[in-house]
Amino acid sequence: MISWLPSVAMGSRLLCCVALCLLGAGPADSGLTQTPRHLVKARGQQVTLSCFPISGHLSLYWYQQAVGQGPQLLIQYYNREERGKGNFPERFSAQQFPDSHSELNMTSLELTDSALYLCASSPNEDSEYGETLYFGEGSRLTVVEDLKKVSPPKVTVFEPSEAEISRTLKATLVCLATGFYPDHVELSWWVNGKEVRDGVSTDPEPYKEQSGANVSSYCLSSRLRVSATFWHNPRNHFRCQVQFHGLGKDDQWDYPEAKPVTQNVSADTWGRADCGFTSASYQQGVLSATILYEILLGKATLYAILVSVLALMAKVKRKDS
C-alpha cells in the first residue's frame, strides 16, 4: 500500500515519490488484479492489458515503468471518465468499462515499449492532501526484434560437496538455469513433492551470461541448504523448477524449432546415503530385498502344501489298513 499525491500537475515531485515507493517495496496484495502478468511480443505486434480494480474504487491509473527508471503516469480515470494523461503515445489507447475494469491497448509495438505496466486504484479522487493507491502485481512486457531469440532455460542441479558436509554438517544443492531469453522466469525448490522456501537463496534477478549488446541469453542460480542428515536420506527427492514465461499458444510461430511457449523446466536429484549408496543403488537394494522376501515366502508356502499333502496321504493309508 502506497500513499502519495497522484495529481498529474505534481510533475517531478510525483515521479520522485512514486519511484522511491515502488522501487523500495513489492506490489501490495490489495485485491486489485492485472492480466496477463507476462508478455513476449515481436516488434509491430499489439497487446491488450486488463486491470480489475478493488470494488468500490472510483479512481484508476495506468503507469509505465521502464528498466532503471521510475514509473511514468500514462492515463488517469475517475468514475470511468478520463481525468488526465502523462506521456501517452498515439499508438496507445485505454478505456474503463461500466463494470469498472479497464483495458490498456498498445499497437505497433516498439522495442522501447518493453516495461512493467502497473495499474492502481483508489477509493476517491486525488486531492491536495494525498490519496492512497493500491497497486497490482503489474504486467511485464518484453518486445523483441525477432521471436526466434526467445528460448526456454536449461536447468541443472548440482549436488552438495562432501567438504562442506564434513565441515558444517550442512548440504547445499545448487540449481543453475542457463540460456533463456527473455528474463521472464520464476524459480522454486520442491522437496518430496512440496514447495519449500526455508533455506532457499536465489539471485535477486537473472543476469546476462556474457557482457555485450549482442548477447541476449540470461542465467539464474539458486541454492537450497538442508542438514547433512536430511541430504543423506536416499528417500528424499529434490527438484528445482523454473517457470519460463514465453510465447502464448495463440502466438504465430514460423520456425522449424519447437515453439518456446510458457513452460516449466525442471531438474532433480535424490539424497545420497552416508555409507556410499546412491539413490539408484538404494532402490535396487530395496527391490532385491522385496524379491528375496517373496521367494522365501513362496518356498514356505510350497513347503506347507507339501507337508499337508504328505499328512493327507498318511491319513488315507491308515484308513485303508
Swiss-Prot record:
Residue numbers spanned by region D segment: 123-128
Keyword Glycoprotein assigned: yes
Biological processes, Gene Ontology terms: cell surface receptor signaling pathway
Glycosylation sites: 105, 214, 264
Annotated region described as J segment, given as residue ranges: 129-144
PROSITE patterns: IG_LIKE
SMART domains documented for this protein: IG (SM00409), IGc1 (SM00407)
Region (C region): 145-321
Superkingdom, taxonomy of origin: Viruses
Classification via InterPro entries: Ig-like_dom, Ig-like_dom_sf, Ig-like_fold, Ig_C1-set, Ig_sub, Ig_V-set, TCR_beta_variable
Keywords attached to this entry: Glycoprotein, Immunoglobulin domain, Receptor, Signal
Pfam families named among the record's database cross-references: C1-set, V-set
Signal peptide positions (record): 1-28
Keyword match Heme: no
SUPFAM superfamilies on file: Immunoglobulin
Region of interest (V segment), ranges: 29-122
A Gene Ontology cellular-component term: plasma membrane
Protein name: Viral T-cell receptor beta chain-like T17T-22
Organism: Feline leukemia virus
Gene it is expressed from: V-TCR
